[in-house]
Amino acid sequence: MLDRTNSEFEFRGVNHLALVCKDMAKTVRFYRDVLGMPLIKTIDLPEGSGQHFFFDIGNGDSLAFFWFANAPEGAPGIASPQALPGHGSMITAHGSMNHIAFDVPADKFDA
């Protein structure tokens, strides 16, 4: 097997993933209050165009969200899946994010 270690950049993992949310308050309530992820940073974007905020997901990694004041509505089937598994297509467009999965111990969730 080839050694594919990157000697130029010392990649240590993913610093953060950034998604776009429709409602900042609901997003914060879910990730902070339901999932227990600490909200660690909030940035107001220039000219009142929105906010960028970060949740601690452990191991020095973050899950980030943008909220844009004038963002267009989502486009199911293009930017997000049209349906849940078993209920229709899970296909999304190139460059879109289909889902995010968190690594948690099996005894901490009900499958």
Language-model-detected regions and their locations in the chain:
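Core-facing hydrophobic residues within beta-strands of well-ordered domains
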Residues: 11-14, 97
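Short aromatic/hydrophobic contact patches that present stacked aromatics
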Residues: 16-18, 54, 99-101
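Aromatic-acidic/polar surface patches that form glycan- and anion
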Residues: 10, 20, 102
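Core segments of cupin and vicinal oxygen chelate
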Residues: 20-72
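A detector for short, charged/polar N-terminal pre-domain segments
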Residues: 1-9
